[in-house]
Amino acid sequence: MSPSRVGRTVLVALATLIALGSAKAAVRDLSALVEPYQKASSEQALGILAAKAYMEPSRGGAEPTPQAAVSLVLLPYSAAFEADLDAVKAGLRDSADSYIRAVGAIEAVRVDYEKGLVAAGAGELVRNEATDARGLAEVTGLPAGDWLLLAWREGGHQSKDLKVRDPDAKRYSDIPTTMTYSMVTYWRSRVTVRTGETVEVSLSDRNVWMTAPRQEGGPPKPPRPQPPKKRR
């Protein structure tokens, strides 16, 4: 084997080792993050989270309207996870594409963090619940510590008529002229769970964290331009 090929082989091997080391370090970091929660669980240092979702009354003297079917997920607090969520919200108004894709981006960030917890042997720390017809939800047996609550509710389906340019309408007769979507309302809160105590969280239209559409149907994405053929 020539010296140059030996050098390339060594570089590839080093790059592989670095990548593996980085991946293991990431898992170790997450394992360190969840260790206090697992210790609290083993010591039965547990608390409860009680959530209440509602809409404020539109007129004085009326009762709040309970919000059923609000999904909740409680995850061990992570500054990195929180920063990833903030990044999605910060880019919400950058473009129409960012606005439409925000819900998918939030879900991707959440799922990635949940997978990381499972990989670190802490899948039991991913806690899910939903509010009932009274707008109430309770999560019991939470290890003491800081948690990040992410909650969301999907609204009714809406439609919007689209303007299609004449040339496109003639060329593509099957272009949809209506976009259907639903609005997703998010709440986010950092909560501290203490042993033997119940922490209460209110989810109302006054403390919404983010609102974005989930597109369900509409115009197809434009095809990617084909790269020019290389001349031989």
Predicted regions and their residues:
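Primarily secretory-pathway and cell-envelope proteins
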Residues: 25-112, 153-232
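Short, small/polar residue-rich loop motifs at catalytic or cofactor-binding pockets
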Residues: 123-125
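Short beta-strand segments within Ig-like beta-sandwich modules, predominantly Fibronectin type-III
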Residues: 128-131
